[in-house]
Amino acid sequence: MDIKKLMQEMVTRDASDLFFRAGGIPRLRIDGKVVPMDTRVLSIEDVMFATEQLANTKQCEVFRNKLDVDFAVYLAEFNRRFRVSIFTQRNWPSIVIRNV
C-alpha cells in the first residue's frame, strides 16, 4: 500500500492524523473522529516499505536499532510538513503521521 497516496487523501480530507499499523487497517483522524480508509489489513512489509519511503537512511537505522524514531518531513508534492512517529506496539510496527 502506497503511504504517499494515503497522505494525499489525508491532506484532501483535512485529517490531522494518519494511523498505519501492521495487523490493522489505515485510519484517519478527522474532526476528532477516527475513520477507516480501507478494508485491507496492513502487513509488516507494508509498514516497513512505508518506513523506507518516509525516513532517510539514518532514521531507518535508528528504527531498526531502537524500534522507535520520530522526525519531521516536508513533502513538496503536498506543500506540507508532517511529524512522523515510527514505533513498535505489541511487537507490530506502526506509523503515526501528523499533518502540521
Regions found by a protein language model. Give the residues of each.
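N-terminal "pre-motor" subdomain/linker immediately upstream of P-loop NTPase catalytic cores
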Residues: 1-100
